[in-house]
C-alpha cells in the first residue's frame, strides 16, 4: 500500500491538503522536517501516513494527556494500532503496553516528554526499531514561546542515546521566527525540509467588541447559537465562575473549567464538552491545548489575552473542521492592568537567570502592547495577525487591505446598532442579568430575530447551510446517531465522523459500500464499523419523508 492507499484506507480521504504531501514525501525520503501549519490544516496526517509505511515505531512526543487520548482514540477508530504512555496509566498498564509494542502491535506510540527521561522507557527504546520521533506542539521547546515546557529540552539527549538516529519531525501551529530558530537548533534538525503553509485561517471570522455589558452580550449570543459548540475564555477563575453562574441561571447548557476545580471535576466537565453533552465551556486558558474537538463554532474571549500568540492559538480552536466559525474578543481597558499584573508577578523560571528573566518580562510587555494594538486597530484584523507572524497577505489592488471577513473590514450596521445596547453595564437590564423566565423568553425571541444580521458577517454561515431544509433534518438525525454511537464506544462524537463528513453524507445520500466510501472522511475501517448503521438511518429518514408526502 502506498501513501495514497494509506490516506484512503485508514482516513477516508482521496487527496492530501496543501503542504501535507511535501512533508510526507520528505519523511519517506529519510529527511527531518519542520511543519508550521495552522490549526485544522492536518498536521497529524503528515506524520501518521509515513509512520504506517515505515518499518519501525514512530514515537510522538505530546505535551498533554487529553491530546494523546484523543489522537490514539481517533487512530484506533480508523483501524490503526496506536497507544499512549503517560502518567494516567498504572505501572502494570505501561509494562503491558511496552510489551505489546516490542511484539510489533503498535506502529505509533504517543508519549509525554517526561517519560523519555525514565530508565524503563529508555530501555524499551533501545531494544526496538524507532523509525521516527515526532515532536508535536514543537513551540513548547522554546523559552521565548508562550507554552515553554522544560521537559522538551531533553528530547535531543534521548535521541542521542538510541542505537540509530531516527528521522525527527516537528510540528506547530504558531511560531515566530525566534521560536522557529529555537526548534531547529534545540532539536538539532539535520538539513530539514521546512514548510510554512501560512498562518491564515480563512474560515474564521475575527471580531473585536468595545463593550461594557459583556454578560448581556454573551447571554444573547448563546441564546442565538443554541445548537453550536463554543468556548468562552476568561482571564481569571473568578470571571469563569461569574459567567458560568449567569449563563447557568438563565437556563443555558454550559460547563466550566479552571485549575481551582478538582481533577475529577475538570475531567468530568471536559468530557461533557467533548462528548457534546454540554455544548459550551467557560474556561481559563488552562483549557484547550489538548482539545482536538473539530466542531467548535465560536470562541469568545471575555477578557483580552496576554499576547497574539495566545489569542491566535485559543481562537484557533474554532473551526478545526474547516467550516465557518467566529472568534470574538470583548475588549475593556481593565484587561491591560490584569495582564500587566500577571506578567510582573509571575513565578520565576528556575531554568533562567536574572538577566534572562528581565529580558523575558520586557518581551512579554511588548507582546501585550501588540495585543492591545490589535484590539484598537481600525485596519484589517486578519492582516494584523498575519503580519505579526511575519506573513504579508496578497493585496494585488494595493491600498487598504480588506479580508471581507472581520469586524473592521465588514461594517454591519445592524450589528453596530445591536452593540450599542451593550455599551453600558445594566443599560438594558438591571444587574445582575435577569433570571426571570419571561425576560429570557423575550431575549430568545429578539435574539433569534437579530441573529441573521447582528451576529454574522456575510461569510459567517453554519456548515449545514449548504443543505436544504430536508438535508438539515437528516444532518441532525445523523448527528444524534453519531452521539449515541460515541457514548456506546467511549470516544468523542467527532472521532466517529466529523460534521463535514456528515454533511457530505447528506449531500451524497449513500446506499451502498461504494457510495459510502466516496464520502470524505469514510475509510474502510470506519465503513466496516459504522457504514451500515448510518446508511440504515439515511434510508429510514428518506422512507419516512416519502410516507409523509404520500399522506
What does each model-identified segment do?
Residues 26, 301, 374, 504-505:
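Short alpha-helical segment immediately N-terminal to, or the first helix within
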Residues 164, 378, 509:
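Flexible coil/turn residues that form the inter-helical turn or adjacent wing/linker of helix-turn-helix
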Residues 20-23, 371, 502:
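Short alpha-helical "packing" element that flanks the helix-turn-helix/winged-helix DNA-binding module
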Residues 1-10, 14, 18, 22-44, ...:
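Helicase motor core with emphasis on the C-terminal RecA-like subdomain
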